[in-house]
Amino acid sequence: FRPLKPGEQYHPLMSPDKNYPEVNLWSVLWGIAMAILFSAASAYLGLKVGQVFEAAIPIAIIAVGVSSAAKRKSALGENVIIQSIGACSGVIVAGAIFTLPALYILQDKYPEMTVDFFQMFISSLLGGVLGILFLIPFRKYFVSEKHGEYPFPEATASTQVLVSGEKGGSQAKPLLFAGLIGGLYDFIVATF
């Protein structure tokens, strides 16, 4: 990823002239499954350690693996949707786990103050939706006009994972090999 030269036009990897599978039952269900799984993991880690992790890269890797295992062709758009739905989990959870305990502590100190779970759920949901809605107007600006000018390492890494998965073959082999080595290392460290 590099800044565009003066007068150079940005050409997206997925051509706007073609029709790709993107938002469908497959991608939405897998995205929701990833959001649930990584929300639980992020909430546990956040409450235990006080820090949440960003789930975009692991979800991108899982999306590529699941699509490859299901032998889905032209799955880049679907994988982007899976990754986008799933990756919101860490952000929403972080907002909730750092504020909800404080509200319950305040309720313990001031019994007249009530904390309703449904209100907290709706406020978290609306916060996520508003965040997406406020970001939509900036999408074209950051993707097309400011392409390569800002170092967004996580977004760049997620994009590389998704593109490598779409190309398959030799591009995806280092990802698989690195994942196996990492899993083996983690197994050895956790077991012995």
Annotate the PLM regions.
Residues 1-192:
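Alpha-helical multipass membrane-protein architecture
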